[in-house]
From Swiss-Prot:
Chief subcellular location: plastid
Gene3D superfamilies linked to this entry: 2.40.30.20, ATP synthase alpha/beta chain, C-terminal domain, P-loop containing nucleotide triphosphate hydrolases
Protein's organism: Pinus koraiensis
Family membership: Belongs to the ATPase alpha/beta chains family.
Bilayer topology term: Peripheral membrane protein
EC class: translocase
Gene name tied to this protein: atpA
Primary role: Produces ATP from ADP in the presence of a proton gradient across the membrane. The alpha chain is a regulatory subunit.
E.C. number(s) listed in UniProt: 7.1.2.2
Pfam families per UniProt: ATP-synt_ab, ATP-synt_ab_C, ATP-synt_ab_N
Catalytic activity, as annotated: ATP + H2O + 4 H(+)(in) = ADP + phosphate + 5 H(+)(out)
Protein's recorded name: ATP synthase subunit alpha, chloroplastic
Keywords in alphabetical order: ATP synthesis, ATP-binding, CF(1), Chloroplast, Hydrogen ion transport, Ion transport, Membrane, Nucleotide-binding, Plastid, Thylakoid, Translocase, Transport
InterPro entries the record matches: ATP_synth_asu-like_sf, ATP_synth_asu_C, ATP_synth_asu_C_sf, ATP_synth_F1_a_nt-bd_dom, ATP_synth_F1_asu, ATPase_a/bsu_AS, ATPase_F1/V1/A1_a/bsu_N, ATPase_F1/V1/A1_a/bsu_N_sf
């Protein structure tokens, strides 16, 4: 009996010796010193890289941002409620990256590119770094193709080109998101992939935008990246970079893409919150010193690629909110200096019923007419000048009692041109319809109408052209020029 036990024991020992694995696992580990407000301070992690992902014992992931001599400051990508003092932390050796694929089109995802629309997982075999480097000088070419927004005021006077960065700036409730969403709706049949990034917004506002896209068939070519107001600051900070990585995937596949950041003021506030909690020194308006770099490295990723790289493009339309129209605040001035122009939306114009409430005098596109088709250049040349003269005359006319006939005519023309620029939300116009509208206004065909009749007349004119003069649209679409034949067809219709 004793022998049997000894045999059993020796066989167990032999078995254990055979199964013994002498591989040594080396891990970069640390322990939590302190946690709260979405920030954890970690002792250890001596070889961690800046921006490296770290994993806590409960599965929460964070990013190492502050590398101190005695501890590491980590921002959490979750609520971190299960993390306690003394919990273990492991460095993953990875920088934040997301899966990318064509299957993302039509989906709503969060800042980690995980679906949040309840339509199941998204299949992807490729990965992109969230913080990818921007294309270099040799990889780019100058912007020369238009990105049509469908808004007359923008396409005629503040044209946006494919690969440009055009800031949309204005107070809250002035129609900034409406301009951006109309631009996405207008890309239907234009072969442009759109990414809409919602940062720190109400969930109801994001749902409304997604519903609009679904009703109008725009989700087929759109990806929505959403981190709402109740999301951790880390995810609100990351969301724009995730959107840019998804758009870049299509740009490097020789496609045209456009991205809306709605809005970067909220991203800057989330970054300020993280920086102050990490005890980084505050600067102007309590923002950290590198808040300019926060936005410049994001917006520099917009580009028109060279012919060697396939001529894809990424057009960025960042939105920034101002307080009481103050464009000289810190974040607005930063964004204006980084971008290639701005569309300024005015609360006064919005309240006066001029919508979209674009202040043409303060708005500018630094790409200019290079991003317009020849037909638009030809008819829109006079429009900006006439509107500028009208604005000056209107201010002067408030003090003058008797005006000569020429001045009265100019004021009447200006009022009708201003009426011509008004558009309903979610009703973008095709470029040929815009050209017909502008030509009608600048050549005096609206002068005999009452101001209240102008919009109705223009709607009927556009319908008549589509129904009875389809050649007009065909000429402009195929040649891109306002030929004598097109002019004759339009004048017949008028």
């Amino acid at each position: 009996m004793g022998n049997l036990q000894i045999d059993e024991i020796s066989s167990i020992i032999r078995k254990q010796i055979k199964q013994y694995n002498d591989a040594v696992g080396v891990g970069n580990l640390g322990t939590v010193l302190q946690v709260g407000d979405g920030i954890a301070r970690i002792h250890g992690l001596y070889e961690v890289m800046a921006g490296e992902l770290v994993e806590f014992g409960d599965g929460t992931v964070g990013i190492a941002l502050n590398l101190g001599s005695d501890n590491v400051g980590v921002v959490l990508m979750g609520d971190g409620l299960m993390i306690q003092e003394g919990s273990s932390v492991r460095a993953t050796g990875k920088i934040a990256q997301i899966p990318v694929s064509d299957a993302y089109l039509g989906r709503v995802v969060n800042a980690l590119a995980q679906p949040i629309d309840g339509k199941g997982q998204i299949s992807a075999s490729e990965f992109r770094l969230i913080e990818s480097p921007a294309p270099g000088i040799i990889s780019r070419r100058s912007v020369y193709e238009p990105l049509q927004t469908g808004l007359i005021a923008i396409d005629s006077m503040i044209p946006i080109g494919r690969g440009q960065r055009e800031l949309i700036i204005g107070d809250r409730q002035t129609g900034k998101t409406a301009v951006a969403t109309d631009t996405i709706l207008n890309q239907k049949s234009q072969n442009v992939i759109c990414v809409y990034v919602a940062i720190g917004q109400r969930a109801s506002s994001v749902a409304q935008v997604v519903n609009t896209f679904q009703e109008r068939g725009a989700m087929e070519y759109t990806i929505v990246v959403a981190e709402t107001a109740d999301s951790p600051a880390t995810l609100q900070y990351l969301a724009p970079y995730t959107g840019a990585a998804l758009a870049e995937y299509f740009m490097y596949k020789k496609q045209h893409t456009s991205i809306i950041y709605d809005d970067l003021s909220k991203q800057a506030q989330a970054y300020r919150q993280m920086s102050l909690l990490l005890r980084r020194p505050p600067g102007r308006e309590a923002y950290p010193g590198d808040v300019f770099y926060l936005h410049s490295r994001l917006l520099e990723r917009a580009a028109k690629l060279s012919s060697q790289l396939g001529e894809g493009s990424l057009t960025a339309l960042p939105i920034v909110e101002t307080q009481a129209g103050d464009v000289s605040a810190y974040i607005p001035t930063n964004a204006i200096s980084i971008t290639d122009g701005q569309i300024f939306l005015s609360a006064d114009l919005f309240n006066a019923g001029i919508r979209p409430a674009i202040n043409v005098g303060l708005s500018v596109s630094r790409v200019g007419s290079a991003a317009q088709i020849k037909a638009m250049k030809k008819v829109a040349g006079k429009l900006k000048l006439e509107l500028a003269q009208f604005a000056e005359l209107e201010a002067f006319a408030q003090f003058a009692s008797d005006l000569d006939k020429a001045t009265q005519d100019q004021l009447a023309r200006g009022q009708r041109l201003r009426e011509l620029l008004k558009q309903s939300q979610s009703a973008p116009l095709k470029v040929e319809e815009q050209i017909a509208t502008i030509y009608t206004g600048t050549n005096g065909y609206l002068d005999i109408l009452e101001i209240a009749q102008v919009r109705n007349f223009l709607v009927r004119l556009r319908e008549y052209l589509i129904k009875n003069k389809p050649q007009f649209g065909e000429i402009i679409c195929s040649t891109g020029t306002f030929t004598e034949e097109a002019k004759a067809l339009l004048e017949e219709a008028l």
